[in-house]
Amino acid sequence: DPLSSLFLLIITGIGFLIHFYSTAYMHEEEPMHFGRYFAYLNLFVFSMLLLVLGGNYVVMFIGWEGVGLCSYLLIGFWFKNNNYNAAAKKAFIMNRIGDLGFLLAVFWLIVKLGTVSYASVFAAVGQLSATDITIITTLLFVGAMGKSAQIPLYTWLPDAMAGPTPVSALIHAATMVTAGIYMIARSNILYTMAPATQTLVAIIGLSTAIFAATIALKQNDIKKVLAYSTVSQLGYMFLGLGVGAYTGAVFHVMTHAFFKALLFLGAGSVIHAMHHEQDITKMGGLKSKLPITHLTFLLGCIAIAGVPPFSGFFSKDEILMAAYATNPIFYYVGMGGALLTAFYMFRLYSLTFLGNFRGTAHQQEHLHESPIAMTLPLMVLAFFAVVAGFIGIPELFAPNAHALEHFLAPVFAGSTAIAHAHHIEHATEWILMGTATTIILIVIVYAITKFKKYETAEPNTGIAKVLENKWYIDELYDTVIVKPLYWFASVLKNSVEKLVIDGAVNGVGKLVGYGSRQFRLLQSGQVGSYILMMVMALVLFIIIWFNDNTIMYFIHKIF
């Protein structure tokens, strides 16, 4: 159907470009690891295609688990590094928590409706009570929170930067993180009938968008900034789903796939040129040395900042306008996040490409543009980052020009939430759009002016230190969840494992040993003793043989 076919285009289109780019990026790997990398990458794409092509929740779940496994394999691709292995395990475990929610929702559907086929579930949705629908949608959302990195299950995604950069582009742009959006968009009829869950989705999405954007302000690792940017943009998509703008959310998935893949692959090109340096404070002045990377990266930054007529402007604006129609507070908070996005993206751009070079003399000597296999995908993605928005021109500019809305109409036709109860007046929309664009442009100019002459920075203090350390959420999880679990596990190990389980196993062994030692005492080696035993046994046998009835009667009397 239209929704699956749109995701197919995103997955296969961007997946192909990432495969093509990887041939150059991974050329230094040994042949065995080069082959292993592409095997994992293809399995990843296969799992994602299975996820979006399945006609029921079980097939979706199989694809869902497949992308989880492949992300684990790809994040920990360089398995000799223990930090990378830890990041892979973290991603795997965080996703298992979310997957439990998805699995419970599937079981609930089977118990209540006896089917998991989309067509049957949506046709029979009237048989479910309001409580059932709320529980099912909430459990599905827990699954989406894990896969699409929403509060509180988002911490795996920034650590997923441990994998090769093209993997980061594949996970963050085209595939895994959009799976949660796809699932909720696919289940739009269920969510339309669960307003409480929809509000929860909107609030969590908006909170994540702002929260991740604040962390991105103070990150210096080029891939970490883009990772938190992804978490933030996913928050906007969930905001769109939560306010019933399903088309807007899917539109943003598509435009985000183009500009985020572009930014990640651009970052890969920079890291390649800088001999694997990822700290943007040690870069600068790369504009002249990497002209294609610079220009395409700049276009990606403008697109994600939401400057018209680039693609990010149309999709983000559609979500924010729907948010305004639902609750103006959602709009203003979301707009704050958009300003933060513009600021941290142009901080990243300025520190990387403008000003003086701050790296080593060796790096400066060997700076050169990446090979054509890496720059060609950048140019293709840059083209789409600029023009992809035109398939979703808002009604404000031209009535009935929103091609994507017409294309997706059959999928979302059953959801009444799309027709917002109170539509925004065109005059209000013009004012909001004009004001937002003006402020975003001011923020961009401010960020470039502030960071283009950057030399060295003072160590962060106060709130800046907190943002640099990601609000200490990882440390909080470690203290509140991980360490108590370790303590509980050690208690179980020392009491239940050692005393009860090992005690039972070892006790049986000791009992057998003790019994055998007692029987050994009978084997004295004296022939006379053996003859005596044989005679006694023979006498006993004769007595039983001739008195069997009496003995049986006696036994019956006793028992």
Regions found by a protein language model. Give the residues of each.
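Polynucleotide-recognition surfaces of large bacterial nucleic-acid defense/processing enzymes
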Residues: 325-339, 365-385, 399, 411, ...
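Hydrophobic core of alpha-helical transmembrane segments in multi-pass integral membrane proteins
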Residues: 16, 106, 210, 434-448
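Hydrophobic alpha-helical transmembrane segments
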Residues: 2-12, 130-144, 333-338, 416-442
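Hydrophobic alpha-helical membrane-insertion segments
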Residues: 98-107, 300-304, 377-397, 485-495, ...
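Alpha-helical transmembrane segments
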Residues: 18-19, 213-215, 348, 442-452, ...
